[in-house]
A protein has these predicted regions:
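C-terminal transmembrane bundle of multi-pass solute transporters/carriers
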Residues: 23, 30, 44, 56-57, ...
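Extracytoplasmic gate region of multi-pass secondary transporters
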Residues: 48-54
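C-terminal membrane-cytosol helix-exit motif in multi-pass small-molecule transporters
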Residues: 1-10, 204-208
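Juxtamembrane intracellular "pre-TM" segments in multi-pass secondary transporters
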Residues: 6-39, 223-232
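Charged, solvent-exposed alpha-helical segments that act as regulatory interaction surfaces
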Residues: 8, 35, 53, 212-213
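Mobile cap/lid helix-loop segments that border enzyme active or cofactor-binding sites
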Residues: 42-48
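A short alpha-helix capping/helix-coil boundary motif
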Residues: 4-5, 34-37, 49, 67-68, ...
């Protein structure tokens, strides 16, 4: 591997600096309503999601359970995500309905999270954890597929970076807020408020047609190239 020479990547109008590369990616994001809305919504959505994650150990503890059950909780969610990813890979979502399905799944995830805090048996909570994992796994495949279909290869890494920054930017703040709310009120109230924020935020994706239309919009600055392929 050390002896293999580096093959330079040839790009048209290659950006000369990191600042220019990020500016180019941001310029592309602003031309795509579905992408801009998705990044903006997840900036807010992850505030509620992170606050909920802080409350999970208290849910387990309040039921008189311990670390083993907390581990089972995490394992069931991860298993659900694997199932969801597999199902979405076997039966891809058609592009024309991809955005609608995406935002419906987000709402489903939020409601499943609210059920975790309800006074129900732990086994029933695990059912909702499994469903949340399946929906989340499917959601991830839809978003990654759309990014692959709609973003040119030379922009994909930078756009993915902006997407990740948008998702993570409020996460350092959200656990602090979640812990404070749980301490001040209780787990159920915190979960209810977090889910309300998550659902209200993503409602825009269902209401505004351009947000749920997961299709590349051609512009003079970013024309659609014939070589770019679309997934089913």
């Amino acid at each position: 591997m050390w002896t293999i020479s580096e093959v330079p990547i040839q790009r048209e109008n290659d950006a000369e600096s990191l600042k220019e590369e990020v500016a180019e990616a941001w310029a592309f994001v602003k031309t795509q309503p579905w992408l801009f809305a998705g990044i903006a919504m997840f900036m807010i959505w992850h505030i509620g999601d992170s606050a909920i994650e802080i409350g999970i150990p208290f849910i387990v503890e309040n039921k008189g359970l311990g670390a083993k059950e907390f581990g089972i909780f995490g394992a069931v969610g991860a298993g659900g995500a694997m199932i969801g990813s597999l199902l979405a890979g076997i039966r891809p979502i058609p592009q024309k309905t991809r955005g609608l399905v995406f935002y419906v799944l987000i709402g489903g995830i939020a409601w499943c999270m609210l059920m975790w805090a309800m006074p129900i048996p732990f086994l029933l909570i695990l059912v909702f954890v499994l469903i949340e994992g399946i929906l989340g796994g499917t959601l991830g495949v839809i978003w990654r597929t759309t990014m692959s279909d709609s973003v040119d290869q030379h922009l994909r890494g930078r756009v993915n970076s902006l997407d990740a920054i948008g998702s993570l930017i409020f996460i350092p703040f959200a656990p602090l807020m979640g812990g404070w709310m749980i301490e001040t009120t209780n787990v159920l109230t915190t979960f209810a408020l977090a889910v309300s924020v998550m659902v209200l935020t993503t409602m825009a994706g269902l209401i505004v047609p351009s947000f749920r239309r997961f299709e590349r919009i051609e512009t003079d600055l970013f024309p659609i190239k014939d070589s770019r392929t679309q997934s089913d």
